[in-house]
């Protein structure tokens, strides 16, 4: 039986999955890093959907998640979450990052999505140390999938080889085959 958790090194915008997670900022208006890449690849329909969410409920708070159509992406939907800015680890960053992953998974489960792809949330300009963020991600997702049937497949999509090796090592340590 193949693992429900897999590591992929590459471009998250190119994946054909039910949901791609966007490491968004609170405004949901696009930005740098993976957020900008997803907005560019999805086209203007994604920005329009994000504007509508902002009009209806305001900014997306740290640790929360919202869902939009995927625009021109191959995915069915984009789940936007706001991870914490790293401030040394003493401002509930781990709890907020855990909430971001969990809330994305809850949206995926509620929408009956079979597959979801996560970037390394908060590890870019938000400065969360990659190793610590990966531990939170793997622990949170592993815990979730032991209790829920969906999503059936979770991908950790890493932009660079070093981060991909880090996630693969963590999955191997817990007994999952990351390939």
Swiss-Prot record:
User: Which key words are in the record?
Assistant: Hydrolase
Give the first-level EC class, as a single word: hydrolase
> Entry's Pfam families?
Macro (PF01661)
Where does the record place the Macro domain?
A: 1-175
Which reaction is this enzyme known to catalyze? Answer: 3''-O-acetyl-ADP-D-ribose + H2O = ADP-D-ribose + acetate + H(+); 2''-O-acetyl-ADP-D-ribose + H2O = ADP-D-ribose + acetate + H(+)
Q: How is this protein named in the record?
A: O-acetyl-ADP-ribose deacetylase
Q: What assembly does the database describe for this protein?
A: Homodimer. Interacts with RNase III.
What species is this protein from? Answer: Salmonella agona (strain SL483)
Task: Give the matching SUPFAM superfamilies.
Answer: Macro domain-like (SSF52949)
Its biological function? Deacetylates O-acetyl-ADP ribose to yield ADP-ribose and free acetate. Down-regulates ribonuclease 3 (RNase III) activity. Acts by interacting directly with the region of the ribonuclease that is required for dimerization/activation.
Catalytic residues? 35
Q: Which GO terms describe its biological process?
A: purine nucleoside metabolic process
Q: Indicate whether Hydrolase appears among the record's keywords.
A: yes
Q: Gene that codes for this?
A: ymdB
State any single GO MF term. purine nucleoside binding
Family the entry assigns: Belongs to the MacroD-type family. YmdB subfamily.
Q: What is its EC number?
A: 3.1.1.106
Keyword Membrane recorded: no
Q: List ligand-binding residues for substrate.
A: 11-12, 25, 33-35, 122-126
């Amino acid at each position: 039986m193949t693992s429900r958790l897999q590591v992929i090194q590459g471009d998250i915008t190119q994946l054909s999955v039910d949901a791609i997670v966007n490491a968004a900022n609170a405004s949901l208006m696009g930005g740098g890093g993976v957020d900008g890449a997803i907005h560019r690849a999805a086209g203007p329909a994604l920005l329009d959907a994000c504007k509508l969410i902002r009009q209806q409920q305001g900014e997306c708070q740290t640790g929360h998640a919202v869902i939009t159509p995927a625009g021109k992406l191959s995915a069915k939907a984009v789940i936007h979450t706001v991870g914490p800015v790293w401030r040394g680890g003493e401002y509930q960053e781990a709890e907020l990052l855990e909430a971001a992953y969990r809330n994305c998974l809850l949206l995926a489960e509620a929408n009956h999505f079979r597959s979801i792809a996560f970037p390394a949330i908060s590890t870019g300009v938000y400065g969360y140390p990659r190793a610590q963020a990966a531990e939170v991600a793997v622990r949170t997702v592993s815990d979730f999938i032991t209790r829920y049937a969906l999503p059936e497949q979770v991908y950790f999509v890493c932009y660079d080889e070093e981060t991909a090796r880090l996630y693969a090592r963590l999955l191997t340590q817990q007994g999952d085959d990351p390939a």
